[in-house]
Amino acid sequence: MSSLCYSASRPLFVEHPDETQFHWSKRGSAFLCDFRGSSYAVLARHTVAPYKPEQLRIPVHDGFTAFFSFDYHWQPQGADDCHDIFVLRLTTTANDGDWLGSRAPIESQASAAAASAFVPGGGLAVSGYPGIGENEIDYERNTITNQRFIVEAEYCSSTNEHVHLLRARQSNVINDFGGYSGGLVIARFAEGLVPAGVVITGSAQSSLMRFIDVQGLYLSLDNFAAQVDAA
């Protein structure tokens, strides 16, 4: 996989229709993926609460307020860390800026490939929007600017079924990891990059992030797709 995998991440906002002045607020990160030929956005479920799914807004590209459209949404049942996933099925068809080409492919082979990086010190990276750098909502120009940050990381350990810890390699540049919730975890190999999971929580003080692995994500998307097909 090429470095396009890094550009699969997007900032996540919610829209406040009753607010006359401030229409959007940032909630974290999301990332775009391709599963069996359909497009999805993956989020950390806790970033959605207490808002309604129809309030969620994900920009097609940084710098604009053109948002992805979606129809179905899904979340697993349960309160464990492995259930902290929220998925949207995207219905946007116009491929402006080739966002289709930046989607992270979620395949059964990716699970096996990523798992080989799940050893102490295994090479990982996180792509998301921690809220530093250039971040602005310009209501007069109707633009949203957020800066994506990619941080290198190393695998630490497994904490639960499909849930793991990684340690970000950063020297206190990022003071809060909350914005990375919903960001894409990537396994780095000499041959290229492989989707490895989704960030759920993190602590900048310890430089640790907790993430759900790509196998758990694959199972969630498989469940979601089956329910949509049966609808």
Regions found by a protein language model. Give the residues of each.
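Short glycine/Trp-rich loop-beta-loop segment that forms part of the substrate-binding cleft
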Residues: 105-144
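A mid-sequence, solvent-exposed acidic-amphipathic segment
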Residues: 129-178, 182
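Juxtadomain coupling helices with adjacent low-complexity linkers
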Residues: 215-231
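Catalytic nucleophile loop of clan PA
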Residues: 173-199
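A basic- and aromatic-enriched beta-loop-alpha substructure that forms the phosphate/nucleotide-
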Residues: 68-104
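A structural micro-motif recognizing beta-strand termini
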Residues: 89-95, 109, 166-176
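Catalytic histidine site
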Residues: 2-72, 86, 91, 152-158, ...
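Extended, non-catalytic subsegments within catalytic or DNA/protein-binding/adaptor domains
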Residues: 49-61, 82, 95-101, 137-151
